[in-house]
């Protein structure tokens, strides 16, 4: 099977235009819709392609998943034990301290401020990732993807906490 970029007719680039991605995705969904098949075999084939298109779209539209996928295309798997130890002990310590702060914060406005800080950090990391992939600096891209993953974890925790206090 083609890689997700090829499947959706896109250039393999981290910095993709999300509107073009969406346009390509919907065009391909229409083209391979199972109801358009004339035979049972064609319908089954279209179901497989449609499922693959769904996976490709959900992966490429998400900045973190797209980065992980692009690294995977270069045989770099962030789920490997080695990749999990990319961040320094200081960075990991800060991450765990922040998790504790979030856990102990009960005032919604304080949680919103923390969330805004991490959304800004997430944007900065994504911009840095664009540059790392553009320069084909896979080492830097791997570290930045790992950081983005931790930031995402903090943001998810914040989201849940904010939702529970409203």
From Swiss-Prot:
Matches recorded under PROSITE patterns: DNAJ_2
Keywords: Chaperone
GO terms, molecular function: ATPase activator activity; protein-folding chaperone binding
Record keyword Chaperone present: yes
GO biological process, one term: protein folding
Cited CDD domains: DnaJ
Pfam families reported for this sequence: DnaJ, HSCB_C
Domain J: 3-73
Family matches, as NCBIfam families: hscB
Family (UniProt): Belongs to the HscB family.
Subunit relationships: Interacts with HscA and stimulates its ATPase activity.
UniProt cross-references to PANTHER family, sorted A to Z: IRON-SULFUR CLUSTER CO-CHAPERONE PROTEIN HSCB
Biological role stated in the UniProt entry: Co-chaperone involved in the maturation of iron-sulfur cluster-containing proteins. Seems to help targeting proteins to be folded toward HscA.
UniProt-recorded name of the protein: Co-chaperone protein HscB homolog
Organism encoding this protein: Rickettsia canadensis (strain McKiel)
Lineage: Bacteria, Pseudomonadati, Pseudomonadota, Alphaproteobacteria, Rickettsiales
Gene transcribed to yield this protein: hscB
């Amino acid at each position: 099977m083609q890689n997700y970029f090829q499947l959706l007719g896109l250039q393999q680039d981290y910095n993709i235009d999300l509107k073009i991605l969406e346009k390509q995705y919907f065009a391909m969904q229409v083209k391979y819709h199972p109801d358009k098949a004339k035979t049972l075999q064609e319908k089954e084939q279209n179901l497989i392609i449609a499922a693959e298109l769904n996976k490709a779209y959900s992966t490429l539209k998400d900045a973190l998943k797209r980065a992980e996928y692009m690294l995977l295309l270069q045989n770099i798997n962030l789920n490997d034990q080695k990749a999990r130890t990319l961040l320094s002990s200081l960075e990991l310590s800060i991450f765990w301290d922040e998790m504790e702060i979030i856990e102990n914060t009960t005032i919604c406005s304080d949680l919103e401020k923390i969330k805004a800080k991490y959304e800004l950090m997430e944007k900065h990391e994504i911009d840095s990732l664009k540059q790392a992939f553009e320069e084909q600096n896979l080492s830097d891209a791997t570290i930045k993807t790992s950081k983005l993953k931790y930031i995402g974890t903090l943001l998810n925790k914040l989201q849940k906490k904010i939702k529970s206090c409203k």
